[in-house]
Amino acid sequence: MEDGGKHFVFVHGLGHGAWCWYRVVAALRAAGHRATALDMAAAGAHPARADEVGSLEEYSRPLLDAVAAAAPGERLVLVGHSLGGLSLALAMERFPDKVAAAVFLAACMPAAGKHMGITLEEFMRRIKPDFFMDSKTIVLNTNQEPRTAVLLGPKLLAEKLYNRSPPEDLTLATMLVRPGTNYIDDPIMKDETLLTEGNYGSVKRVFLVAMDDASSDEEMQRWTIDLSPGVEVEELAGADHMAMCSKPRELCDLLLRIAAKYD
């Protein structure tokens, strides 16, 4: 990393992995910055199975460990996509001094003083019964109460997530997605005292609106933003839900502007 370079840490959404950030990571590294894309537990190339990960905390452990391990004085730019916003929130609450800025890309962005699951619950309330299309629900074999995961189907990926992305990225996704859980029934999602103004609320937040998102539409994204007055808002014109694939250059430019603003 060149002198003055930033360290960006990326967190994927449901069913995806570090692999979905490959275009953005390559561009940022070429520009002299450090870029780390993580696999959450039981996602991407992470060795755990979905039935072995019982909570949002366990799922987010790779991010929490990475932020905890940041060098003294190093302040990270965290970037979370979709469900990855919930993992960002946990890291921000726990390590606010280690985060220069948190970027929520068409993401679940909780509000300080409200329960963690508020935006995810609203999203689930808004979607139609057939939203998940050809996705498959998988019953997980656990020692706890029965839980389910979803394997995103090729049709859903094509029509709701990658609808403006290159066909190569859609093909890659159909090969690499894994069953994922949103942890909406995790007790932590109901805790209204978890995210505080003093920690989570003290970190600079930027919400990036994917303007052509066919999954979490603009109205839902604006609803999320309205929960947190004062959050900076940027727009990615022509971006589908997978903005890192459909608009990688524009996303990189925005991230560099954000990183330069919040040091």
From Swiss-Prot:
The active site is at S82, D213, H241. Gene3D superfamilies: alpha/beta hydrolase (3.40.50.1820). PROSITE patterns: LIPASE_SER. SUPFAM superfamilies: alpha/beta-Hydrolases. It comes from the Eukaryota. One of its GO terms (molecular function) is methyl salicylate esterase activity. The keyword NADP does not apply. InterPro entries: AB_hydrolase_1, AB_hydrolase_fold, MES/HNL. Coiled coil: none annotated. One of its GO terms (biological process) is jasmonic acid metabolic process. Its EC number is 3.1.-.-. Keywords: Hydrolase, Serine esterase. Belongs to the AB hydrolase superfamily. This is Probable esterase PIR7A. It comes from Oryza sativa subsp. indica (Rice). The gene is PIR7A.
